[in-house]
Amino acid sequence: INDYLTFIVLLFGLFCVSGNITLSGDLAGSPRINVGLLALGTLLSSWIGTTGASMLMIRPIIKMNAWRKRRRHIVIFFIFMVSNMGGCLTPIGDPPLLMGFMRGVPFFWSLKLLPILIFNMIILLFIFYHFDMKAYRKDIAAGLKPDISKPGTEVKIRGSHNLIFIIMIVIAVILSG
């Protein structure tokens, strides 16, 4: 039961902390922006957990693409990349790696998977970009436009003080091994 309790406490802590961080801005959901956010979310998954990264990144992605009619593929690729594949680099990102860490596997052992993760990210982001560009062009041709008053690149982070708690959780997990 100790293993499961550790897992639940970590998951709950990252869920609560990352759920109180909000990213917002006036970015429109274009293929380039979506690729950037998927890449960022995938890399974040190993450091704040797949649940934490999913909580943090899904709201801005949904909001930025709300104006689009063709957007199902965005959530599908989000689940593949951020909610699953991205957690492979540290025990914080993936429950089986956490169990291994609790049984003596070094914390940074799985970092050797970084080249494989990057390779898979490039392939999936390339495929995603082509799906998204095709859907984006159809939406624009249908007369749909982003729902922002003044396009720009301003991104706001609310609840940034919670980043300190995320760092504390990560350090606590590393020190517990």
Q: Residue locations for each model-derived region?
A:
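Transmembrane helix-loop junctions at the membrane interface of multipass transporters and ion channels
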Residues: 89-110, 170-177
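Hydrophobic transmembrane alpha-helices that form the pore/transport pathway of multi-pass ion
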Residues: 32-86, 99
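Transmembrane alpha-helix boundary signature
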Residues: 1, 12-30, 43-56
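Transmembrane-helix bundle segments that line or gate the permeation/cavity pathway
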Residues: 53-58, 73, 77-92, 116-143
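Hydrophobic transmembrane alpha-helices of multi-pass small-molecule transporters
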Residues: 1-23, 115-119, 126-177
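Residue-level signature of transmembrane alpha-helical entry/exit and packing/kink sites
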Residues: 3, 7, 30-38, 75, ...
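Membrane-interfacial helix termini and the short, flexible loops that connect transmembrane helices
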Residues: 19-31, 59-70, 143-150
